[in-house]
């Protein structure tokens, strides 16, 4: 198989090797001498070589390299989100980079079965060499979580605070502290959603119209239920309608919503939740097509991280059972299983949007002005003006 970036002889035509003035070679550019010599097998150093230790090391090093790439993409996305007004080209770039993160996470999920080719006895042969090293000590994964938006108060505390394992590394503590204090992707997405066009009370006032539509829908359903001949069926339907009225109250009453946020059941601000619901309802409008794709990708990221955690939990249970402590002193399987809860879903509110959907026929119709604002098609006067301004720059 040929090299993907060039001929090993330095000449793409198969001639003589070029001198150093022609540029670095493949191995030099990728610094493969360092990368491929970084697999230090402690079992070999102890004169008790264990074959599967090499697989364990390579797999986890691959994880760390991909974590580094995800962090690189996240930092660039957060930078693009930091401006108050985002051009369409920026949204496209954000979509591209979010999709790249999704593809990487899919790869990481599929990487777990490779480790599972190792049996529990194989792992036991070199497990003692790992202590006190543990995946709990992966600095990059903690940075990744913080940059996405996992809050300290939502983390499960088992035996120790997540940052305490880095106490001997001041640089690591400083990096974690920075990511805890700077705006996460979730913070920036919320601010972006709060600016969703159509939420203005002196404009389209989507939220007011949505609340009216919900009240009308529930009133119609209540009237229909009252006509039910069978008393038990009527009571069941009325009880169901009342439950749904309470559910909708949790989004229409800002104080109820804020209480749910304080309790950790919701993450988004009230205004950001309004924006997410509006984008979901009018996702077929040109201006909301890309924002809706963006919300879908954020949920994909959350879903894939949860799948990766789950695969990791199952693998750990297969390797060491559910009672042993992890090599780093954590509670092992019990701790990992606890991270599967919704506490670790950064964009949990996006998953729960379907709770508040209403039939298409009940969705508030767009006014002519709002229809025009959300339908900036190619060739429209507004779009042409933007193109002229862009060309003049």
Curated annotation (Swiss-Prot):
Binding, substrate: 56-60, 127, 327
EC number: 1.13.11.11
InterPro entries to which the protein is assigned, alphabetical: Trp/Indoleamine_2_3_dOase-like, Trp_2_3_dOase
Ways its activity is controlled: Stimulated by low concentrations of hydrogen peroxide (5 uM), ascorbate (0.1-0.3 mM), and sodium hydrosulfite (0.1 mM). Inhibited by high concentrations of hydrogen peroxide (0.1 mM), ascorbate (10 mM), and sodium hydrosulfite (1 mM).
Top enzyme category: oxidoreductase
Pathway(s) annotated for this protein in UniProt: Amino-acid degradation; L-tryptophan degradation via kynurenine pathway; L-kynurenine from L-tryptophan: step 1/2; Pigment biosynthesis; ommochrome biosynthesis
GO biological processes: L-tryptophan catabolic process to acetyl-CoA; L-tryptophan catabolic process to kynurenine; ommochrome biosynthetic process
Cofactor detail note: Binds 1 heme group per subunit.
Protein function: Heme-dependent dioxygenase that catalyzes the oxidative cleavage of the L-tryptophan (L-Trp) pyrrole ring and converts L-tryptophan to N-formyl-L-kynurenine. Catalyzes the oxidative cleavage of the indole moiety.
Assigned protein family: Belongs to the tryptophan 2,3-dioxygenase family.
UniProt name for this protein: Tryptophan 2,3-dioxygenase
Organism: Aedes aegypti (Yellowfever mosquito)
């Amino acid at each position: 198989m040929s090299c993907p970036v060039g001929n090993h002889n330095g000449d793409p035509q198969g001639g003589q090797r070029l001198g150093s003035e022609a540029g670095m070679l493949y191995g030099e550019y990728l610094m493969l001498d360092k990368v491929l010599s970084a697999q230090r097998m402690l079992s070999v150093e102890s004169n008790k070589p264990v074959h599967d230790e090499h697989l364990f090391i390579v797999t986890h090093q691959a994880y760390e390299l991909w974590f580094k790439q995800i962090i690189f993409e996240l930092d660039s996305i957060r930078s693009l989100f930091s401006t108050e007004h985002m051009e369409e080209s920026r949204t496209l770039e954000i979509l591209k980079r979010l999709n790249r993160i999704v593809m990487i996470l899919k790869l990481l999920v599929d990487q777990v079965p490779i480790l599972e080719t190792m049996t529990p006895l194989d792992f036991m042969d070199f497990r003692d060499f790992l202590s006190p090293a543990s995946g709990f000590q992966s600095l990059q994964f903690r940075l990744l979580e913080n940059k996405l938006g996992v809050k300290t108060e939502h983390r499960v505390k088992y035996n120790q605070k997540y940052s305490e394992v880095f106490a001997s590394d001041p640089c690591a503590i400083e990096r974690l502290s920075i990511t805890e204090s700077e705006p996460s992707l979730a913070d920036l997405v919320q601010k972006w959603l709060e600016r969703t066009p159509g939420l203005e009370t002196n404009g389209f006032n989507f939220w007011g119209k949505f609340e009216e539509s919900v009240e009308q829908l529930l009133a119609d359903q209540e009237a229909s239920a009252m006509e039910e001949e069978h008393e038990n069926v009527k009571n069941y339907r009325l009880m169901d309608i009342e439950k749904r009225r309470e559910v909708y109250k949790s989004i229409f009453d800002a104080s109820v919503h804020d209480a749910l946020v304080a309790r950790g059941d919701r993450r988004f601000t009230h205004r950001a939740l309004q924006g997410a619901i509006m984008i979901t309802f009018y996702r077929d409008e040109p201006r909301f097509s890309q924002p809706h794709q963006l919300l879908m990708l954020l949920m994909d990221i959350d879903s894939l991280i949860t799948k990766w955690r789950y695969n990791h939990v199952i693998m750990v249970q297969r390797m060491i059972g559910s009672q042993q402590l992890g090599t780093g002193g954590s509670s092992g399987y019990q701790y990992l299983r606890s991270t599967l809860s919704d506490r670790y879903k950064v964009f949990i509110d996006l998953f729960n949007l379907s709770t508040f959907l209403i039939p298409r026929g009940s969705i508030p119709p767009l006014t002519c002005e709002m229809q025009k604002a959300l339908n900036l098609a190619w060739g429209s006067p507004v779009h042409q003006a933007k193109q002229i301004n862009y060309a003049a720059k």
